[in-house]
């Protein structure tokens, strides 16, 4: 039977003490501990990998989103909102279905395959090609704030850093 052994060495006792101090600081400042303690968000067993945002945390989230919106608006972005459940045909066309399907939440309804949206790119391309445009209309700057979901393996979930559901500030530029 094999057993893995980890070792760490330091040039001096001072370096070791600094390392141990940093480990303790990291534990003290861990967002997985601070978020619930500060009343910002929680994770519950009924929805693994999806945050339940509490009032203070969601207020903070909205403040950041509004700040970002102002920046994008000043730079000429148009804000859009696209469906968060989309036909698998779109993802087959974009290539995501073949390469990313194992990370998507699939839904079967009325004999059709759908998936929750893991990224905005294909939907933004649908919006772009929905009308004839002149090169004079470019660049087209599209921004979206919306929910996305990705099926991350349970062993990879890590607080807010690796989740299954999140809101993303996403933008695409269509240029000539």
Where are the predicted features?
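Auxiliary tRNA-acceptor-end handling modules of aminoacyl-tRNA synthetases
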Residues: 1-157, 161, 173
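Short, flexible turn/loop "capping" segments at secondary-structure junctions
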Residues: 163-166
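Catalytic palm active-site di-aspartate
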Residues: 168-170
């Amino acid at each position: 039977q094999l057993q893995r052994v980890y070792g760490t060495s330091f040039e001096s006792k001072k370096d070791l003490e600094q390392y141990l101090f940093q480990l303790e600081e990291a534990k003290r400042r861990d967002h997985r501990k601070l978020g619930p303690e500060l009343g910002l968000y929680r994770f519950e067993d009924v929805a693994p990998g999806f945050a339940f945002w509490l009032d203070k945390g969601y207020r903070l989230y909205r403040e950041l989103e509004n700040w970002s919106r102002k920046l994008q608006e000043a730079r000429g972005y148009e804000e859009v909102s696209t469906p968060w459940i989309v036909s698998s045909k779109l993802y087959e066309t974009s290539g995501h279905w073949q390469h990313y399907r194992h990370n998507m939440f699939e839904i079967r309804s009325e004999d059709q395959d759908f998936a929750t949206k893991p990224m905005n790119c294909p939907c933004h391309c649908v919006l772009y090609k929905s009308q004839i445009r002149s090169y004079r209309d470019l660049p087209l700057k599209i921004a979206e704030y919306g929910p996305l979901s990705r099926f991350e393996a349970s062993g990879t979930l890590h607080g807010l850093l690796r989740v299954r559901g999140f809101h993303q500030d996403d933008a695409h530029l269509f240029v000539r």
